[in-house]
Amino acid sequence: MPEHWTRNHLDVIARLGWVEEPTPLLSCDEEASRRALASLTIKRDDLTSPLVGGTKTRKLDFLLASPEWQGQKKWASVGAIGSGHLVALAAAAKELEAHLDAHMFWEPISQGVKENLAFVAGGPTTIRYYGNRISMVLRRPRLVSGGIIGGAKVVPPGASSPIGTLGLVRAGLELADQVAAGELPSPDHLYVAYGSGG
């Protein structure tokens, strides 16, 4: 195992090439000053890809390129009605000419939830609604255990899988490269946005 990993170590693993890296860094000098910090920098992963931004695209970049997904044109996955994961999957389905069975459960309505739901509904998708995640899992346990449901291969919730996680590992290595290149000082602390945890 290499002493110091770089993104090059992951280049032997198939990817779709959707991530435009490195994502830019935004220096927030005024906010850093207000908080008495030496620096404050935001990594703009919302600009990960023209397809759709965010870490889900990083995960799908590896997951959907893996051998078990080659030729799969019908997918199923789960998320709340405003799920960023289902947005990324709907965009991926359109890009790869696939179809997504989106199994959704309730969450409180916000503008972002409405926008995400509209995006998923406008894609190559069939939406199946459940009142809550418990009833969904009881009625369709394969949505969380994996396999095939209704002829569709199940994408793990949040695209969280060993191969999908490589997208996040690559993001961390990308940030390390940016620090090494002097694009930002070595951070004392890293804060990561946490939605559903998927």
PLM feature segments, named:
Residues 1-198:
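PLP-dependent amino-acid enzyme catalytic core
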